[in-house]
Curated annotation (Swiss-Prot):
<feature type="binding site">
    <location>
        <begin position="34"/>
        <end position="35"/>
    </location>
    <ligand>
        <name>4-CDP-2-C-methyl-D-erythritol 2-phosphate</name>
    </ligand>
</feature>
<dbReference type="InterPro" id="IPR036571">
    <property type="entry name" value="MECDP_synthase_sf"/>
</dbReference>
<comment type="subunit">
    <text>Homotrimer.</text>
</comment>
<feature type="site" description="Transition state stabilizer">
    <location>
        <position position="133"/>
    </location>
</feature>
<keyword id="KW-0479">Metal-binding</keyword>
<feature type="binding site">
    <location>
        <position position="10"/>
    </location>
    <ligand>
        <name>a divalent metal cation</name>
    </ligand>
</feature>
<keyword id="KW-0456">Lyase</keyword>
<comment type="similarity">
    <text>Belongs to the IspF family.</text>
</comment>
<dbReference type="GO" id="GO:0016114">
    <property type="term" value="P:terpenoid biosynthetic process"/>
</dbReference>
<dbReference type="GO" id="GO:0008685">
    <property type="term" value="F:2-C-methyl-D-erythritol 2,4-cyclodiphosphate synthase activity"/>
</dbReference>
<dbReference type="GO" id="GO:0019288">
    <property type="term" value="P:isopentenyl diphosphate biosynthetic process, methylerythritol 4-phosphate pathway"/>
</dbReference>
<keyword id="KW-0414">Isoprene biosynthesis</keyword>
<feature type="binding site">
    <location>
        <position position="42"/>
    </location>
    <ligand>
        <name>a divalent metal cation</name>
    </ligand>
</feature>
<feature type="binding site">
    <location>
        <position position="142"/>
    </location>
    <ligand>
        <name>4-CDP-2-C-methyl-D-erythritol 2-phosphate</name>
    </ligand>
</feature>
<feature type="binding site">
    <location>
        <begin position="8"/>
        <end position="10"/>
    </location>
    <ligand>
        <name>4-CDP-2-C-methyl-D-erythritol 2-phosphate</name>
    </ligand>
</feature>
<comment type="pathway">
    <text>Isoprenoid biosynthesis; isopentenyl diphosphate biosynthesis via DXP pathway; isopentenyl diphosphate from 1-deoxy-D-xylulose 5-phosphate: step 4/6.</text>
</comment>
<feature type="site" description="Transition state stabilizer">
    <location>
        <position position="34"/>
    </location>
</feature>
Amino acid sequence: MRIGIGIDVHPFAEGRKLVIGGVHIPGHNGLDGHSDADVLLHAVSDALLGAAALGDIGLHFPNTSQEFKDIDSMILLKQVRKLLEKHGYQTVNIDAMLLLEEPKIAPYITGMRKNIARCLDIEIGMVSVKATTNEKLGYIGREEGAAAHAVCIIRSL
């Protein structure tokens, strides 16, 4: 068994679609980034890559490459799964935490869990997604951006 941790942060930006955990959340500015800026899937991807000692998301999907411009992060997470499998690993568990003031995420969590499970070819019961606010503190509290933390366990195939 190996453990990984991933963290990602993105600022909000006008004119972008908000996508978290592969779920479109209407009525709110999106997150800014080279890809779709899915803060949750980026944190999960980094946790998995770290657990396998395979670097990070920036190494495999650099923000300098047009290939990944505005790409759906579910595609990236599926690529991470394939990379893990190539190196003899599979996902055992994902536990993730979103940090943002608005919008409220509770109605979307089941969809996020399903998307992560589908990308990683695991059961939904192996994926936990939670959300909390920053109690109005810092850039998250001022609603300037969002962050996600993820911890994973992987094992040899």
